[in-house]
UniProtKB/Swiss-Prot annotation:
Pathway entry: Amino-acid biosynthesis; L-histidine biosynthesis; L-histidine from 5-phospho-alpha-D-ribose 1-diphosphate: step 5/9
Native source organism of the sequence: Xanthomonas oryzae pv. oryzae (strain KACC10331 / KXO85)
The protein, known as: Imidazole glycerol phosphate synthase subunit HisF
Lineage: Bacteria, Pseudomonadati, Pseudomonadota, Gammaproteobacteria, Lysobacterales
Gene Ontology CC annotations of this record: cytoplasm
Domain of life of the source: Bacteria
Amino acid sequence: MLSRRIIPCLDVRNGRVVKGVKFHDHIDMGDIVELALRYRAQGADELVFYDIGASPEGRSVDYTWVERVARLIDIPFCVAGGIGDVETARAVLHAGADKISINSPALGRPQLISELADAFGVQCVVVGIDSIREDDGQWRVRRYTGDPSKTQALPMRTLDWVAEAQRLGAGEIVLNCMDNDGVRRGYDIAQLRQVRALCHVPLIASGGAGEMQHFADVFDQADVDGALAASVFHSGAIPIPELKQFLRAQQIEVRDGQ
């Protein structure tokens, strides 16, 4: 196993970083570039930026802030939001992103995954999956979660979509466990373990980090390749250098800070 990755997630709306709870009630957390520079200095392994309004609003990501981030940081970063075709993806990568992530557009047209993988290589193509547990006990996917008024429940089971996304060429899966998002009670280990059993590409856990032990738990118990978090990093509740020191003490291999 390679070193586990620590990945701050920055949800972007109207050019600012925001954060909600279970994808609702977003509040302003700060400037995109300022936060990106802070995380780079703290030793984040990479960054993920979600333009959360892009897909619900039927537009592509704003390239201007992608270019600003690319000029100032030297760690890998991934961009998501309204990337619905090869040309849009090319523009985002040309602006400086290392990877692109697709979610709602891929649910609407799964072949997009293959088109992007063919154009740029699977290493550039991340598929984000917003998943929630329904009353029958099954996890199913949601679309357009960046706007609660437009969020759609789909009949597709999360596990089936993970398998299909890999078949089509996804190079990495980010599983956003919506039930756990922003509540800081830990990652959804049960769901992540089921996904891990059939996921043969890097798997990133998202949703639920509240304390350092939660990161250790998700690495040890769900065998994920990376852990993504937002509110605990934005608020300063968990400083990344201290987190990495804690994980090393738990015999979990992480990269040294920058």
